[in-house]
Amino acid sequence: MDVGYAAEERAMLNARAEAIIADCPGVFPLIARGFGAEPQRDALVYLRTAADNAPVTTSGETFLGLLAAAAAWFRREGIGPDDAVSILAPNCTATSIAYWAAMGAAIVHPLNLLFSQEAIAAQVNAVKAKVLFAPPPGTPGGLYEKAESLLASTPSLKRIVVLPLDGRVAFDDETIEPDPNWRQRLQSPSASGAEDRIAALLPTGGTTGAPKVVRLSNRNIVASAAASMLAYKITREDRMLLSLPLFHVGGAFCSSLSSFAAGAALVIPTAGALRNPEVVAGYWRIIENQRITIGALVPTALGAVAGVPTAGADLSRLRFFATGASVCPPEIERRFLAAWPGDSVRQVYGMTEFAGAITSTPHDRAQPAGSVGLPVALVEVAVLADGIIHRGPSPGGEILARGPQTFPGYLDERQKGAVFHEGWLRSGDIGRIGADGEVYVTGRIKDVIIRGGHNIDPAGIEDAALAFPGVALAAAVGLPDSYAGETPMLFVTAAPGATIDRAALAAFVESHILEAPARPRAIAILDEMPVTPIGKIFKPKLREIAAEQAARDAIAATLPNVRVDICASTDGERGLALTATVPAGFAAPVRAALGSLPLPFDIVAA
């Protein structure tokens, strides 16, 4: 099986994507294009429970009619194409209608359901949302209650609109009835506004720290969805299981909109998705019963599902699985493939600032070990190394990307900084390009910690630690983790003459960090903080220390009485890697222990 694209294949792929963008300058005409030919096909299937044998099924005809009706509702409410609509609600039929209608008729602003009250308030104030959609009062997580409290403190916010989670489509008590004239309202190229109109405002930069909002245009979004649809050859015969939230580009554009663009069905496995233990336990049976052909999970969810017996479920329709948000550890992929006998889990690499995927491995291409795939349609990838932009096979450096998916900027342009280099979007990730054009991600320049797909700004952790009496310096990095990919690890040094109590520091930091995922999993008190020649904390060294700690913990869990010397190092080829010096006879169990971590490693004899 080939790895890269021939020049003619790449040209054909790009031409198809360009044609879609030309025909569909916005989300409404794109969805209408997908279902217009066969509107009787399923568009959305919502399971109210994991064992729902009669899920709420919405045809393409009804789906488009509901979008047209919801767009008219926005107009009646005085919400226009330049107004923001915030959504703080889990996936369900009503949320989907509100989300895509808001994107077509206004500017959708989906909120991370894990946001704290303070983070939600900061976001909604930043975008000046006129309306906020939330689930009913009493919904787990207190989402409605968080939303309601904003009315008194957010001048722009006029009302909170309740979305039912039972499969009905209603905004508060007003049932939304499908508009039978959806074709004339949605199929027009101007139905969603001009291609450069901002249609979405997506939070990024984590659940902590100052609001950072990515502006995405119609063209960005359509290009992203078209590229994902073409990469995986999605057709109207497919049925995709949606396990990612709509506040994430993977759930919104790489999964949902790419399916709608092809006229394929999207299946929502309850409002809780993979946070619902019943969905995890019944995952393979859902795939069988709903005739799923495409699945997508973040690595943490892959690990959870890998431990669920298939129990004879018929998985013969399943074409492929994709994963993203962070690089999937080889051990998790191995365990998952032991349950589902596919050839590999297809890695997707992308950014919110790129409206979704930068690279992915098409299901009909070989995926070299460690690769995150090939650039998707209309995307160019390069590597910046030693001041030189390499557009072919390259040494290690910062990954760059460009294409019509590239965002025009942040809501607050002061946050833009040096995000572009000579017209290329800087990823902040370290990697290289292989001989066949495949891309490898080996590390990060940026300091964001990615815990199970959730971005955590280390500054919030560091600020909390620095407020503790006696702490002189503080730095947080990712601690490699077999389940979450990485978790926060905090390093501190004491001020001269001070003594730091680790337990007291841990309790203090936890009390000052609102988001549970951002609370440090481990704390190390150092005699001296590693710094660069100009005095800046040198985080690559801290990541090496964290990697060594994670490796020792993984080995000790199964081999508590075996001495294994661990050394972490960083280079441009492999990034952060481990070397384990192992006593005779213990290479196999040490290899198994280290295989659960998302890091390359070598075993050498003692």
Predicted regions and their residues:
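Structural core segment of the AMP-binding/adenylate-forming
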Residues: 106-177, 601-605
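AMP-binding/adenylate-forming catalytic core of the ANL superfamily
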Residues: 115-122, 132-134, 295, 403, ...
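Conserved pre-ATP/AMP-binding loop-to-beta segment of ANL
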Residues: 22-24, 39-42, 162, 178-203, ...
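Conserved AMP-binding/adenylate-forming
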Residues: 269, 297, 321-324, 328, ...
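Conserved AMP-binding/adenylation subdomain of ANL enzymes
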Residues: 222-239, 249-293
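Conserved structural elements of the adenylate-forming
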Residues: 63-70, 214-235, 243, 253, ...
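Conserved AMP-binding A3 loop
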Residues: 56-62, 199-223
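Conserved AMP-binding/adenylate-forming core of the ANL superfamily
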Residues: 23, 43-92, 96-99, 116-121, ...
